UniProtKB/Swiss-Prot annotation:
Residues 470-490 have a biased composition (Basic residues). InterPro entries: G_ENGA (IPR031166), GTP-bd (IPR006073), GTPase_Der (IPR016484), KH_dom-like (IPR032859), KH_dom-like_a/b (IPR015946), P-loop_NTPase (IPR027417), Small_GTP-bd (IPR005225). One of its GO terms (biological process) is ribosome biogenesis. Keywords: GTP-binding, Nucleotide-binding, Repeat, Ribosome biogenesis. Residues 3-166, 196-369 form the EngA-type G domain. Associates with the 50S ribosomal subunit. The keyword Cell wall biogenesis/degradation does not apply. Residues 452-490 are annotated as: Disordered. This is GTPase Der. The keyword Transcription regulation does not apply. GTP 1 binds at residues 9-16, 56-60, 118-121. CDD domains: EngA1 (cd01894), EngA2 (cd01895).
Length: 490
């Protein structure tokens, strides 16, 4: 399961700055997700092969209204749900009464908590550690979030007990796994043994649990016509046509302002974790409501996580032809950014169209985890460049030399060349569409990463032979004598 890290602390200690710096490492900020209070944000980040979910909580002032009330309103849920709590304090302001109250609460919860002394610029680190030692949460980790100082040490401590992502490939592995001349091959991994993990996600009351029951053929998940019936993510293994699957039924993510019970607030993290844990995401929408903004938020997170995607419009039965045509137009207009995903019009209640989901799941999973040899990917690149060359940069043209596979689920294609940092986004989209069309990729995002040409001798110090050293000395002596003669003539 993807670990969850919560940032807590008083107002203005740098939590949001830290949140932006950490999530910007993958440009995967997911701000203002529904189901969050006004001052909380959820984001996804990755550090040294470890993905994690980050929560930016509201500031806790510890004023006269009491610590418990503030914690319940802003940060208690994040602390309870988190695997690790980073307790940010202001090294400049020093140890305050509010810090003491927050520290006492964390000790009572028996959570893995670390004190992070932020704004350490021009402050003695040893003094900062001593300042916050009375809280009893270990030595403070000195950082300067605004400038990135100490961030690596903080993440190393926070994530050291969590393994690297399962689909992380070691450098160079992509070239050796597939022999030249072999067209493609399926990447072995946990999914081959345990079955394809499918996360069923969507807003509350769109029919996710009904769909799970229909796919299983039995009532395994309690279903009521009440949003938020499913309180936690439920993992259900099963087999169909000798294929293994595991369905993950997630609690519905409620719209902000409609959450009243603590247990439903937890469902936001559970949904995000389920997306990261899945191989394929089936995104369920209510056809009668069409595409709403909250659907786009959830789709955005699934895309940032790089998961294969299948879209199911539920409650299609009972709609008039005119209503169906309107919904299809809305889908084309608002879901253009996921045009690679199969869309199914289903009725989970009556089973119409549900069986077709399995083929899309299989196709999406295969596209997400298939590996191609370097020669194949490079040939596609050469054909694409031949048909439509990269633009000129000044008087020089961008050169793209070769490509190889850098990862799977989603497929990551690494392209090497010169001036690659100047490749425009429009050309990146052209390459993505070309690879998707030629490789017949369906249902999965595709990512392209560029690497510039590197000097293989950079950093190598050339050791001179004795003969070269003597020659260099003679030449330097000759130049000195020549300079002296020129000065004497003047």
């Amino acid at each position: 399961m993807v670990p969850v890290i919560a940032l807590v602390g008083r107002p203005n200690v740098g939590k949001s700055t830290m949140f932006n710096r950490l999530t910007r490492t993958r440009d995967a900020i997911v701000g203002d997700l529904s189901g969050l209070t006004r001052d909380r944000q959820y984001g996804e980040a990755k550090w040294q092969g470890r993905s994690y979910i980050l929560i930016d909580t509201g500031g806790i002032s510890g004023d006269e209204h009491g610590m418990d009330e503030k914690m319940a309103e802003q940060s208690l849920l994040a602390i309870e749900e988190a695997d690790v709590v980073l307790f940010l304090v202001d090294a400049r302001a020093g140890y305050t009464a509010a810090d003491q109250m927050i520290g006492e609460h964390l000790r009572k919860r028996n959570k893995r908590s670390y004190v992070v002394a932020n704004k350490i610029d021009n402050i003695d680190e040893n003094l900062a550690r001593a300042e916050f030692s009375p809280m009893g949460l270990g030595d403070a980790i000195p950082v300067a979030g605004a400038h990135g100082r100490g961030i690596s040490q903080m993440l190393e401590i926070a994530l050291r007990e969590f393994p690297k992502d399962e689909d992380e490939l070691e450098e160079g592995e992509e070239v050796e796994e597939v022999a030249e001349g072999q067209e493609a091959k399926r990447i072995p991994g946990p999914s081959e043994k345990d079955g394809i993990k499918i996360a069923i996600i969507g807003r509350p009351n769109v029919g996710k649990s009904t769909l799970v029951n229909r796919m299983l053929g039995e009532d395994r998940v309690i279903v009521y016509d009440e949003p938020g019936t499913t309180r936690d993510s439920i993992y259900i293994p099963f087999e169909r046509n000798e294929e293994k699957y595991t369905l993950i039924d997630t609690a519905g993510v409620r719209k902000r302002g409609k959450i009243h019970e603590e247990v439903e607030k937890f469902s936001v993290v559970k949904t995000l974790q389920a997306i990261k844990d899945a191989n394929v995401v089936i995104f369920v929408m209510d056809a009668r409501e069409g595409v709403v903004d909250h659907d786009l938020n959830l789709l955005g997170f699934a895309l940032e996580a790089g998961r294969a995607l299948v879209i199911a419009l539920n409650k299609w039965d009972g709609m008039t032809p005119g209503e169906r045509d309107f919904v299809k137009i809305e889908l084309e207009r608002r879901l253009f950014f996921v045009d690679f995903a199969d869309i199914h019009f289903i009725s989970a209640m009556h089973g119409t169209g549900v069986g077709n989901l399995y083929q899309s799941v299989q196709n999406s999973f295969k596209s997400a985890v298939t590996r191609w040899p370097t020669s194949r990917l490079t040939q596609i690149l050469e054909d694409a460049v031949s048909e439509h060359a990269p633009p000129m940069v000044g008087s020089r043209r961008i050169k793209l030399r070769y490509a190889h596979l850098g990862g799977a689920n989603p497929p990551l294609i690494v392209i090497h060349g010169n001036q690659v940092e100047k490749v425009p986004k429009s050309y990146v989209r052209y390459l993505e569409n070309t690879y998707r069309r030629v490789l017949k990729l369906v249902g999965t995002p595709i990512r392209i990463e560029f690497k510039g040409g590197e000097n293989p001798y950079e950093g190598n110090k050339n050791t001179l032979t004795d003969r070269q050293v003597n020659k260099k000395r003679r030449m330097m002596s000759h130049h000195k004598k020549a300079d002296k003669k020129r000065r004497d003539k003047r």
